[in-house]
Regions:
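Short, structured segments at the rim of ligand-binding sites
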Residues: 1-427
Length: 427
């Protein structure tokens, strides 16, 4: 295991390149199954969730060739299994996308209940609702999810809640189903559109992605293609917070400013200056941080994945801020870590009330999940002195080369191996 050792208290200045979108990559990689041929996927982030997805494809029988650090050729012509191993399924929540892709191509798929971050209940009932609307049967036994169908037929699905995962899984299952599928009350995030674009490049007929109704006309077969994944707007937002929390000056390259608008608006509201270019953003802060009210919502609202980072930033705002979590039930588990640093935060259910303090103090910290871990890193960068962040495996799931990128911006941060005997004593 590793930890990060961070000496904070200095502004971060410089340029950073943003990698491919994690939430698009973990759906697009399973989608290559539908091609039954070769796909060249570019701008893949080098993160553990992507590596796990590639390993799953390999275990299913795909032939995978690494072209460069961010480009892979994937040939799914000769898959010989429709069951994802328990170990790999439980490494990441997004393993459930293999259900939709395997069901769509082979009429059968099986994965273990997925792992990933513990943010409260993440039921798959909306995924299964879509599959059954297409004529599939499902069973959940002994932690295994199995879906099967002799003949998939398009259907009309109105999702009870807006779910990114269910929307994408339904798209994967429907593109090869006979007839027309209509999906209503769907998620509209940029990675939904990216998946639709990729499916269409492979020969699918998907319309309406980015709106709340998606229409899919089933096709008989699909083919391989070359595709480049969109930039990760959450990674970009994280480095914007890094500039804001350290009074820095950071220019982000390889971004789509339109995708950043909900984040950019809030950072401007707290007192940051943001300049927009064609594929870049520059963020600076010189004055005091201002408090604000924030509620996470489905896109185009403020993204839940940015909530822990904004909460960390608002601990230093002058006045009272209120943050309401509108997506996940258990997303404030990290707050105690910020309180250890001197933050003044009261949590009542889904609402956090933050009284700004003048400074955060260094402390031993724990990454309770992916985005909370990133928030701990940003808080440590703002605190004068040395902090340590444990359980960084969560952070590496979603941030490519985060230590190296922060070092290039002037951060004093390094990875340190934790001896096995120290880990066992902690357990």
């Amino acid at each position: 295991m590793e930890k990060y050792v961070i000496r904070g208290g200095k502004p971060l200045v410089g340029d950073v390149n943003i990698g491919g979108a994690k939430n698009a990559a973990v759906a697009i990689l399973p989608a290559t199954i539908l091609a039954g041929g070769k796909c060249l996927i570019e701008n893949l982030p080098c993160i553990s969730d992507v590596m796990a997805s590639l390993q799953i494809l390999s275990e299913l029988g795909a032939n995978i060739r690494m072209v460069s650090r961010s480009t892979y050729e994937i040939d799914t012509s000769h898959l010989d299994s429709t069951e994802v191993s328990n170990e790999l399924s439980r490494q990441m929540r997004a393993s459930y996308y293999f259900l939709g892709a395997l069901l769509g191509r082979f009429g059968s798929g099986q994965v273990a209940m997925p792992g990933g971050c513990n943010l409260g209940p993440r039921p798959i009932d909306q995924h299964l609702k879509a599959f059954t609307a297409f004529g599939a049967e499902d069973s959940v036994e002994y932690g295994q999810i199995h879906v099967r169908s002799e003949h998939l037929v398009g259907g009309h699905v109105f999702f009870d809640t807006v779910s990114v995962g269910a929307t994408m899984n339904a798209m994967l299952a429907a593109v090869l189903a006979e007839g027309t599928t209509i999906l209503e009350n769907v998620a509209r995030e940029p990675h939904i559109v990216d998946l639709a674009n990729f499916l269409n490049m492979m020969g699918a007929d998907v319309h309406g992605a980015g709106t709340d109704v998606i229409k899919i006309h089933g096709v008989k077969e699909m083919h391989g293609c070359n595709y480049s994944i969109i930039p990760d707007h959450i990674e970009a937002g994280s480095y914007m917070v890094a500039a804001a929390i350290t009074k820095g000056d950071i220019t982000l390259h390889n971004v789509i400013p339109k995708h950043m608008e909900p984040i950019t608006a809030k950072l401007r509201a707290v007192g940051c200056e943001v300049e927009e270019f064609d594929d870049a953003l520059r963020i600076t802060r010189t004055g005091e941080l201002k408090p604000l009210k924030l509620k996470t919502m489905p896109h185009p609202g403020f993204p839940t994945d940015m909530q822990p980072l904004m909460t960390a930033l608002l601990t230093l705002a002058k006045g009272t801020s209120i943050v309401t979590e509108g997506i996940w039930e258990n997303r404030f588990r990290y707050v105690d870590e910020l309180i250890h640093m001197g933050a003044n935060i009261q949590v009542d259910g889904q609402v956090a009330v933050i009284e700004g303090v003048k400074e955060l103090h260094p402390a031993p910290l724990r990454a309770t999940d992916l985005r909370a871990g990133a928030a701990m890193v940003m808080a440590a960068l703002a605190a004068n002195g040395v902090s340590e962040v444990d359980e960084t495996i969560h952070i590496e799931r979603g941030y490519e080369n985060i230590v190296e990128k922060l070092q290039a911006l002037g951060a004093d941060i390094r990875r340190v191996e934790i001896p096995a005997n120290a880990v066992s004593r902690a357990i």
